[in-house]
């Protein structure tokens, strides 16, 4: 396993995930009867700061259809949590208009690179172009100075 599991932290994430799903109207319990489901949800609401009991609640009451989705969500959250510790693995977001993103994605696919690699290549290309333009401007000025001296 690449990322260490932190039971207390992840228990809080699981609790928040289940509460969010409940507020969105999803059935988070395996109970068919409404009163039993409501009792289980009320128990869950009281367990926010009790990680061990949250896991026990999940084992006893959680809807089995939510299990896989919750595992995926927690795995992604764990990855983001650990990647955020280091500057080089921390993800940043930028706002792009859809058409700009679409053109960037097409270029990345054509070059066989990720979006990030493509952005880096575009920046490097622009820097080389600026350097070349600066050198050409300098050469033109030097040539002009030489020709002016001879006349």
Curated annotation (Swiss-Prot):
The record ties this protein, via InterPro entries, to: Arc_rbn_hlx_hlx, MatP, MatP_C, MatP_N, MatP_N_sf
Keyword list (alphabetical) reads:
Cell cycle, Cell division, Cytoplasm, DNA-binding
Q: Which GO terms describe its molecular function?
A: sequence-specific DNA binding
Q: Name one GO biological process term.
A: cell division
The terms describing its cellular component in GO are: cytoplasm
- Signal peptide as annotated in the record: none
Indicate where this protein resides in the cell. Answer: Cytoplasm
Which domain of life, per UniProt? Bacteria
Q: Which residues form a coiled coil?
A: none
Question: What protein family is recorded?
Answer: Belongs to the MatP family.
Q: Please name the HAMAP family in this protein's record.
A: MatP
Q: How does it assemble?
A: Homodimer.
Q: Which NCBIfam families does this chain map to?
A: PRK05097.1
State its role: Required for spatial organization of the terminus region of the chromosome (Ter macrodomain) during the cell cycle. Prevents early segregation of duplicated Ter macrodomains during cell division. Binds specifically to matS, which is a 13 bp signature motif repeated within the Ter macrodomain.
Protein name according to UniProt = Macrodomain Ter protein
From the broadest rank down, the organism's phylogenetic lineage runs: Bacteria, Pseudomonadati, Pseudomonadota, Gammaproteobacteria, Enterobacterales
């Amino acid at each position: 396993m690449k990322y260490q599991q932190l039971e207390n932290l992840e228990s809080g994430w699981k609790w928040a995930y289940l509460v969010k799903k409940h507020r969105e109207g999803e059935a988070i319990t395996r109970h068919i009867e409404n009163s039993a489901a409501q009792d289980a949800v009320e128990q869950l609401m009281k367990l926010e700061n009790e990680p061990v009991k949250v896991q026990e609640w999940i084992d006893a009451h959680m809807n089995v259809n939510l299990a896989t989705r919750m595992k995926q969500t927690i795995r992604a959250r764990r990855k983001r949590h650990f990647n955020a510790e280091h500057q080089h693995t921390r993800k940043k977001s930028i706002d792009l208009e859809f058409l700009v993103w679409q053109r960037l994605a097409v270029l990345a696919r054509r070059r066989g690179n990720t979006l990030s690699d493509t952005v880096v290549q575009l920046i490097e290309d622009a820097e080389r172009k600026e350097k070349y333009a600066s050198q050409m401007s300098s050469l033109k000025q030097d040539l002009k100075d030489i020709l002016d001296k001879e006349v």
